[in-house]
Amino acid sequence: MVSSTSQIISTSPSRDDVVPSRKKVTLPPWLEVAKPRLIPLLLATTLGGMALSEGWPLPSPRLACTLGGGALAAAAAGALNCLWEQDLDGRMKRTSSRALPAGKLSPSAVFTGAISCTLAAAALLVSGVNCLAAGLSLLGLCSYVLLYTAFLKPRTSQNIVIGGVAGAIPPLVGAAAATGHIGLSGWWLFALVMVWTPAHFWALAILLKDDYRSVGIPMLPVVKGSVFTAKAIAQYGWATVLLSCFGVFALPEGGALYGILLVPFNVRLLQMVRRLAADPEDLQRAKGLFRWSILYMFGICLLLVVSRSTLADQFHNQAIYLFTNMGSVFSIA
């Protein structure tokens, strides 16, 4: 089994090619520990939570404070994650050159920066948005660092299923920023991100399973293998597609346009999931699914925003008119 796996890996693309941008772009150490590549998607889902609310569009100052505070909280979470896992990162080839294991930054400097970002995020959100948004952002930070990184990740192969709550909180922050409370629509996007996360992350874990195995992290592909993981990805992929359709009802307006534009996103996601299920050991297929899953969630959030535009309102009204007057439209005089 070991020899066959080695043969597959030797004829597959190098693991260094999983996320090429990490090799091509060298970030300053203080920026690297903030994990800036993760922040745009978190902010996109925050915008999605806003777009689902009756308070959309937000006043520009409140919008800026929400996104700025969210970015600071995410940066703090990334830095604390790097701080917690510095020994682990130092033992993996892929991460050994990161700022902390390589000695480019001191742990005390990273901790000070993380606390400063946390305080700045809280101050910005409390003063410029509301206490609920601030509290939710801090909850997301704590759940990522304490629940996922410190507790779940080293203990269970279902770590990302439960720990995915951290990445699903930004839509709630967006909803809270827009209206001061969390409605059913905000909880729908929270649930969508939760069920999307395992398929997204396990595709990456298939690519990096040897790294995780080398340091004893029980990611699902390490514990159950790529074939089992691909089946689990398919299940969560279908759940994501089905749950995404409820956005038609979650949107206050523009649901019809959202539903139409959603179709190609879901079709492509299912195609990528099916390709991986057909050959779970193909690293290119796993990489393709991982990348598309990111674009998929960006696309969902973009559709939510577009569906709340004036053009979407006009489309929605025309669709309702045609539906309610279908008899007269197609009647023959």
Curated annotation (Swiss-Prot):
The keyword Cell inner membrane applies. GO terms for cellular component: plasma membrane. Converts heme B (protoheme IX) to heme O by substitution of the vinyl group on carbon 2 of heme B porphyrin ring with a hydroxyethyl farnesyl side group. It comes from the Bacteria. PANTHER family: 4-HYDROXYBENZOATE SOLANESYLTRANSFERASE, PROTOHEME IX FARNESYLTRANSFERASE, MITOCHONDRIAL. The chain crosses the membrane at residues 38-58, 63-83, 109-129, 132-152, 160-180, 188-208, 245-265, 286-306. Residues 1-13 have a biased composition (Low complexity). This is Protoheme IX farnesyltransferase. Carbon 2 of the heme B porphyrin ring is defined according to the Fischer nomenclature. It is found in: Cell inner membrane. Keywords: Cell inner membrane, Cell membrane, Heme biosynthesis, Membrane, Transferase, Transmembrane, Transmembrane helix. NCBIfam families: cyoE_ctaB, PRK04375.1-2. Its main location: membrane. It is an enzyme of class 2 (transferase). The keyword tRNA processing does not apply. The gene is ctaB. It catalyses: heme b + (2E,6E)-farnesyl diphosphate + H2O = Fe(II)-heme o + diphosphate. GO terms for biological process: heme O biosynthetic process. Its EC number is 2.5.1.141. Belongs to the UbiA prenyltransferase family. Protoheme IX farnesyltransferase subfamily. The lineage of its organism: Bacteria, Bacillati, Cyanobacteriota, Cyanophyceae, Synechococcales. Pathway: Porphyrin-containing compound metabolism; heme O biosynthesis; heme O from protoheme: step 1/1. It comes from Prochlorococcus marinus (strain SARG / CCMP1375 / SS120).
